[in-house]
Amino acid sequence: MDRVQRLTGPTGLTVHEDQKMLQELAGTIRGIVLDVDGVLTDGKIIYGSDGSEHKHFHVQDGGSLKLLSAQGIAIAIITGRQSSVVQRRADELGITYVSQGADNKAEALDQLITQGFPNTNLCAIGDDVQDFKLFNHPAVTLMATVANAHPAVLAKAQFVTQRRGGDGVIVELSELILRAQGRWPYD
């Protein structure tokens, strides 16, 4: 990849070793668990005067999620909020593993695993401290975040996108994972 990914935190490794470790982790990923607000969207919620809720999703993320699914990577959405807009986007993309209103995202992941979602080698991408329980789930081997995440999340994540939340971050994550697995179709 031409773009630079980075492992953050006190690894004590050289950049080359960090890159190698990141590629090895990405090469094992079987499923991706997505936060919504701040990852798939810019984190802003717009309420219409009629009480309707509006979110902005990046069309490139949709294409990347479809590509990942076509390559056999399972996709799940776990969000702390409840929104018909999120369900509509999940339906549009064919994402069947969806948990909304999750107070504890690790417990929500356990529920999705009982429904057939992979139970090992997962990548979780989140942007705020509420995602720490998910990051610490034993099935999660790669922790990712967005460029404008909470500082504590930036310090914990192993992969940080160059893009901000809602600006096509899944494009970067999908390329990382599929290249590491030798399945990137656009070379």
What kind of feature is each model-predicted range?
Residues 28-44, 135, 170:
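Asp-based phosphoryl-transfer active-site loop
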Residues 54-58, 92-93, 97-99, 106-187:
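Mg2+-dependent phosphoryl-transfer enzymes with acidic/Ser/Thr/Gly-rich catalytic loops
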Residues 28-30, 73, 120-121, 141:
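Short coil/turn segments at beta-strand junctions that form active-site/ligand-binding loops
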Residues 1-34:
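Non-catalytic pre-domain segments flanking phosphatase-related domains
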Residues 15-18, 61, 105, 128:
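Amphipathic coiled-coil/heptad-repeat helices and related helical stalk/stem segments
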Residues 36, 80-81, 102, 147-149:
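Short secondary-structure boundary segments
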Residues 40-70:
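A positional/architectural concept
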Residues 65-89, 135:
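Substrate-recognition element of Asp-dependent hydrolases with the DxDx(T/V) motif
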